A protein has these predicted regions:
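Left-handed beta-helix
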Residues: 1-232
Length: 232
């Protein structure tokens, strides 16, 4: 994740000879400088220039801070703190999970090494989450990759809310809820393997259509060549 963020926000100039761009097919209502790909960022949503948005729809008073990566989610009136990555997945059972972690965290982080995670460390996680080591890792080795932290939700909006609440809990700014402790939770590993790639592709295609229509209407409104609407 950190390598991707660096490439699209700072290192893209090194690849200009390949015609690579930091903004690839999207709508940015504020005309900002953030990096994005196949994303719709409505006017009013603010994204730091050192953030990257992918396959996402941002609207309302959404604010994305620096060094964030946001992928596969819908955000309305949400604040994503600096250095946080959100990655939304639709599962094969029709449910949703939003994985959240620090942009510079290592999924291979190990409990015994007290590896950093978001605003805390892995040894502090059980107390902050109100869960035992066994409840978080079960029979798996205690790597971050296997930690069951992400609630399974009925909608992407609920999953986003749950993910951002997890950020607040691990930062010590909010107490963990009983709903969280009692929820079905998945790890990075489990959610990756349970993802419905067909539905994720459908979401990307529907978002692309929305972007294309918006660019088409904007081109007409600004009296530009309509062909520009199809350009990335």
């Amino acid at each position: 994740t950190r390598e991707l963020l660096h490439l699209v926000t700072e290192g893209i100039e090194d690849y200009e000879f390949l015609n690579w761009k930091s903004q690839v097919f999207g709508v940015e209502g504020n005309g900002g400088d953030c990096a994005y790909s196949n994303s719709y960022i409505q006017e009013g949503a603010k994204v730091n220039a050192r953030a990257y948005i992918e396959d996402s729809y941002l609207y309302g008073e959404t604010h994305i801070a620096e060094q964030c990566v946001v992928s596969g989610v819908t955000l309305k009136d949400k604040i994503v703190p600096a250095g946080v990555t959100l990655h939304g997945l639709k599962l094969r059972n029709g449910k949703f999970v939003v994985r959240v972690y620090g942009t510079f965290d290592n999924p291979k982080g190990f409990l015994a090494d007290d590896a950093p995670f978001l605003h805390t460390t892995m040894k502090q996680m059980p107390e902050l989450l109100g869960l035992s080591v066994e409840e978080i890792w079960g029979a798996e080795e205690p790597y971050l990759w296997f930690a069951k932290m992400y609630p399974v939700c009925d909608s992407i909006e609920e999953a986003v809310t749950a993910a951002l609440e997890l950020v607040e809990v691990l930062a010590g700014r909010q107490k963990v809820s009983e709903n969280y402790k009692n929820a079905q939770r998945m790890s990075l590993y489990e959610s990756f393997n349970a993802a419905d790639t067909t539905q994720m592709l459908a979401w990307q295609e529907n978002l692309e259509k929305k972007i294309r229509i918006s660019r088409f209407l904007k081109a007409i409104d600004e009296r530009k060549e309509v062909a520009e609407a199809a350009l990335s």
